[in-house]
Amino acid sequence: MPSFDIVSEIDMQEVRNAVENATRDLANRWDFRNVPASFELNEKNESIKVVSESDFQVEQLLDILRAQLSKRGIEGAALEIPEEMARSGKTYSVDAKLKQGIESVQAKKLVKLIKDSKLKVQAQIQGEQVRVTGKARDDLQAVMALVRAADLGQPFQFNNFRD
């Protein structure tokens, strides 16, 4: 029976490249001249810290970062940005987390979405991924289209497609 896995993975090398490109963009921007602003990638915590003098500048830096991530093939939904900015002294900062893996709550929503579609497929949670099996390849492709169209707040990839 044909099957595939739904996963949520981020290539950390691409994230590193996007942060480096964003830092390069920051150096070229005239509105950030002589401003202590920076991007800091923490690969252990899978987060990116954005620091600047004002909250408006932090928002601009986040836009630069999102643009660079999308150029490198990483969706903006992969960043989990907190509502509040941390403030220490003269600087504002945001610690944006990178979403990897499918949490159990998200996986349950995904399985429910697939089962509610009434397609002849089975979906089961396997750790941080969801395996979808079905008799017809067309049904599996319909599930892929359904998951892409659904707004679950996290980017998903499909791999391990077996016939």
UniProtKB/Swiss-Prot annotation:
Coiled coil: none annotated. CDD domains: YajQ_like. It holds the Pfam family DUF520. One of its GO terms (cellular component) is cytosol. Keywords: Nucleotide-binding. GO terms for molecular function: nucleotide binding. PANTHER family: UPF0234 PROTEIN YAJQ (PTHR30476:SF0). NCBIfam families: PRK05412.1. Nucleotide-binding protein. Belongs to the YajQ family. This is Nucleotide-binding protein YPO3170. It comes from Yersinia pestis.
